[in-house]
Amino acid sequence: MSEQRVFKHPCQFLTWNSKHNYIVCCSGPYLLGFSCSTGEKIFEHCYRDNINEKHREAAAYGEAIRQVAFSKDYSRMATVSEDKCLRLWDSTQPDKIELLYQKNIPKRCADLCFAGSNEIVFGDKFGDVYCVDENWFTTSEVTEEKKSNVVEGKQEPVNNDTLKDSKLQKLEPIMGHVSILTQLIVAQNPQNSKEEIIITSDKDEHIRISRFPNAFVIEGFCLGHEDFVSRMSLYDNRTLISGGGDNHVFVWDLENFKCLDAFDLRSAFSTYLSLNQPMVVSVILPIFKRQLVAFACEGMAGLIFAKVTPEKRLLFHSALKLSGPVLDAVLLDTDTDQILISLDSSFTFGACFECVKFDEGNAAVLTKPDVIKRIESDGLISTEKPFCPLAQIHTLRKNHSKFIRSVETGTSSPSVESKDN
C-alpha cells in the first residue's frame, strides 16, 4: 500500500480585517489568523475532542468553519461551523482574540453578516433569516465562566459538554424563503442612506430585496437567473452582481431592480481555460478602484476579470491561469488591490495560495510575497487528507437543470439576452 502524501490543508474561507491588517483563514475545523505585515500566526482555534481516532474525522467535519464576519468597527467577529454552533469573539486586539459566547442555532447556517448596529444576521438552509444581538447569547446558560481565551496563539481549555447543554432559546425569523437560502447581504438603502436593506438569494433563482430590520416589507426582486444563485456582491451601494448555476452573471440596479447586463461567463472561461462541465460561480470579487470584477468557478483553476463600464455593463478584460482550483479569494489591500487566492491543494498537493497584483497597464500578474510564503509554509495545518468537503456549491443544482443537459448532449448552452457589446 502506497503511503499517503502529507500536504498543507487548504483554506475553504478567507476574510481580511482591514483595521488591524490580518487575514482569517478557515482550514477545516481550524480558525487561523495571520498578520499581513509579517506572516506571523497571531491566533489559532480548533475544536479539541476526546473521542477515539475512528470518530475524529466525523468530528472534524462537524466543526468545519464555513463563515466568518466582522462587525463594522471590527470589535466583534462571528463564526459558524457545520455543527450549527454560532460563536461570538472579541476581536478588539488582534493578538488576543477572545471567545465571548457560543450557542447552538436551530438549523445549519447558510450565511451570516453584521448589520450596521452590530446585530448578527444569519440565514439557515431552510430559508429562514434571523437577527440577534449580543444579549441573545446571555439569555441561556452561556456565562463568563464558559469563555475561552486565545492568547499568543494558544487556546485555554473549553468545557464543551457544558456549553452544548445550554438550552436553545426560541428564535423567530425576521423573514423567510420557501427554498434553500444561499447568501445574504445587509447594505445601505440606495434610496435612503439612513436606512438598511437586506438582500437574500436562494436555490430557486430568486434574489429578494427587503427592508431591514423590518424584512417583512419587500422592496423588490431581481429576477432573471435560470438556475440557483450562489454568489452576490455589491459593486457599489446601488449595483449588485450575482452568479450561480447559470452560464451568465448578472448586473442589477438596486433602485429599480432591473437587470443592467448579463455577461457570458461560460464563454469567457471556455475560450481561455478547459471547461467541460456545468459552471458554478464561487467567487465574485469587485475591485472598485480599477473598475474590475474577478470571477471564479468551483473546481476551476483560473480567474476571469471583467471591466465595468460607466453604464454598469461587463466587458471581458483578461483571464488568469492558476495552479489549482479556486476555493476563495479576498482583497488584501485596497490601496494596491492585491488579491489573495486560496487553492485546493488536496488535488494538486502544491500551493495553497497564490496572489495577484496589477501592473501599470491594469493587467493582472501572479506574485508570491514572502509574507504569504511564510504563512503557507509555517502557519497552515499539515494533513494526509482533507478534514471536510471543500467544494459544495454544485450540490445546489437540480437534477433536471438544462445547464446539465446542454453539457451532456454537447449542444449549445442556453443563452440569455445580453446588453453588452
Swiss-Prot record:
HAMAP family: TRM82 (MF_03056). GO terms for biological process: tRNA (guanine-N7)-methylation; tRNA modification. InterPro entries: Trm82, WD40/YVTN_repeat-like_dom_sf, WD40_repeat_CS, WD40_repeat_dom_sf, WD40_rpt. WD repeats lie at residues 60-99, 176-222, 224-264. It comes from the Eukaryota. Pathway: tRNA modification; N(7)-methylguanine-tRNA biosynthesis. Belongs to the WD repeat TRM82 family. The keyword Transcription regulation does not apply. This is tRNA (guanine-N(7)-)-methyltransferase non-catalytic subunit trm82. It is found in: Nucleus.
